[in-house]
Amino acid sequence: MSTSWSDRLQNAADMPANMDKHALKKYRREAYHRVFVNRSLAMEKIKCFGFDMDYTLAVYKSPEYESLGFELTVERLVSIGYPQELLSFAYDSTFPTRGLVFDTLYGNLLKVDAYGNLLVCAHGFNFIRGPETREQYPNKFIQRDDTERFYILNTLFNLPETYLLACLVDFFTNCPRYTSCETGFKDGDLFMSYRSMFQDVRDAVDWVHYKGSLKEKTVENLEKYVVKDGKLPLLLSRMKEVGKVFLATNSDYKYTDKIMTYLFDFPHGPKPGSSHRPWQSYFDLILVDARKPLFFGEGTVLRQVDTKTGKLKIGTYTGPLQHGIVYSGGSSDTICDLLGAKGKDILYIGDHIFGDILKSKKRQGWRTFLVIPELAQELHVWTDKSSLFEELQSLDIFLAELYKHLDSSSNERPDISSIQRRIKKVTHDMDMCYGMMGSLFRSGSRQTLFASQVMRYADLYAASFINLLYYPFSYLFRAAHVLMPHESTVEHTHVDINEMESPLATRNRTSVDFKDTDYKRHQLTRSISEIKPPNLFPLAPQEITHCHDEDDDEEEEEEEE
């Protein structure tokens, strides 16, 4: 006779983790199929699944798509007066990474941590270190909230722009025709600041995306530039069986229709053998021209799209949700109203940490899933280069051994210089496995600004949302404990603290023996007058009162009952 899970939970000795200390690893999906969790999320509570299109449903191939964007932007700059020599540059995917900051004063690309501390500094193709860095950043620190000076290149669309900025700075710094200055460069009596150069690049990028031929060239060769995944129709059809599915993209309808038609262009439907369905049938609501992040605030006027011409119909749409109708503009409130959903009912899936994830989380309370295509490469290095991580751990052990028997009375000063040099060398080798700017998420032991934003705003993240295919819709994505150093480096073994050695040991806030505590309180209050407050002492909770990030709101459950 089999034992139920509820019976097994009564006895800790029968728990799987106690039967096998490595049990948890056995239940995990393959790394490349995993969805990673920052905040617990119960999938069965999700009533609506929302999608961005660019770099989410439609993943653009790298480096082909970035190369196209780079070439078109360079051509635009040359057409407005920049040197012809720039046409010789070609996009190099090994240099840029997302999350870099461009300093418009000094023309530097910076990699920083969550607090603005410098991790990497590059002026053009030249990596700056030590005293040279401190001349411009005395504390190796920047004020991230100075958005007039510092621009964060956070999106996948920013990658060509990031590399182009490095190319321009390097060219104007080293070309003999120009005189390099601290905040720009001179050509005779003409001065160009890095701020002006940056603005020219921004304007050129916007022109390429909105007025140029980027979309036209993409559509002309979809097979070259867009990833097509046969599992997409299957996942969306399964989502539609358990909830509602909507698309909210900044792209216009004509471009959206061509991209989505290609993504769903299979001879079959969701499964082999089923009949083909148009892409629109996989969504309950389709919304284009969203203008995110404005979409998550006041939004714009909601209008209806004429799908035959791609033009907008006159007037504001005020009716109920109609299947087969494509809408333009609107806001996140509009989506909630049309779908009859509230914030936490919605899981929004996108790639833009600011436009998709941060704003939907902060302004609407939507649950968030961040798509990070670079995660596949990050995981590859993490697993394939494990020897480097193991060597760093070994070097830490060497350091600990040198200091093992020393305390504040010791005059001995171990020579750790060789170990420090080796740590730096191994850390550098590890960083270079990711690319010239290192990992998207860290530099050595320190997490990047991008990593901190992922942890702060994305409830879930993965290399692709297709990974949801490998989980049931009843799944509880449970967040792992985020350990502080005193937790991650101290074993779970009982240690008797000597109160004579450590006066802090008396700061015990737990009531170990409630009967003894009650007796002491009784002794303390015997002589107090009968006129006293209703409650002299708090009582230790006998039921769960703390929020443990399990995504199990008891009030909601009671309402449903």
Curated annotation (Swiss-Prot):
The modification Phosphoserine is found at S418, S502, S511, S527. Its EC number is 3.1.3.5, 3.1.3.99, 2.7.1.77. Residues 538-561 are annotated as: Disordered. Keywords: Allosteric enzyme, ATP-binding, Cytoplasm, Disease variant, Hereditary spastic paraplegia, Hydrolase, Magnesium, Metal-binding, Neurodegeneration, Nucleotide metabolism, Nucleotide-binding, Phosphoprotein, Transferase. Adenosine 1 binds at N154, Q453. Binds 1 Mg(2+) ion per subunit. It catalyses: a ribonucleoside 5'-phosphate + H2O = a ribonucleoside + phosphate; a 2'-deoxyribonucleoside + a ribonucleoside 5'-phosphate = a ribonucleoside + a 2'-deoxyribonucleoside 5'-phosphate; IMP + H2O = inosine + phosphate; GMP + H2O = guanosine + phosphate. It is found in: Cytoplasm, Cytosol. Adenosine 2 binds at M436. IMP binds at D52, D54, R202, D206, K215, T249, N250, S251, K292. Changing L460P: In SPG45; uncertain significance. Allosterically activated by various compounds including ATP, 2,3-BPG/2,3-Bisphosphoglyceric acid and Ap4A/P1,P4-bis(5'-adenosyl) tetraphosphate. Binding of an allosteric activator is a prerequisiste to magnesium and substrate binding. Inhibited by inorganic phosphate. Its cofactor is Mg(2+). GO terms for molecular function: 5'-nucleotidase activity; ATP binding; GMP 5'-nucleotidase activity; identical protein binding; IMP 5'-nucleotidase activity; metal ion binding; nucleoside phosphotransferase activity; ubiquitin protein ligase activity. One of its GO terms (cellular component) is cytosol. The active site is at D52, D54. Residues 550-561 have a biased composition (Acidic residues). ATP binds at R144, N154, Q453, R456. (2R)-2,3-bisphosphoglycerate binds at R144, K362, Y457. SUPFAM superfamilies: HAD-like. Broad specificity cytosolic 5'-nucleotidase that catalyzes the dephosphorylation of 6-hydroxypurine nucleoside 5'-monophosphates. In addition, possesses a phosphotransferase activity by which it can transfer a phosphate from a donor nucleoside monophosphate to an acceptor nucleoside, preferably inosine, deoxyinosine and guanosine. Has the highest activities for IMP and GMP followed by dIMP, dGMP and XMP. Could also catalyze the transfer of phosphates from pyrimidine monophosphates but with lower efficiency. Belongs to the 5'(3')-deoxyribonucleotidase family. This is Cytosolic purine 5'-nucleotidase. It comes from Homo sapiens. The gene is NT5C2.
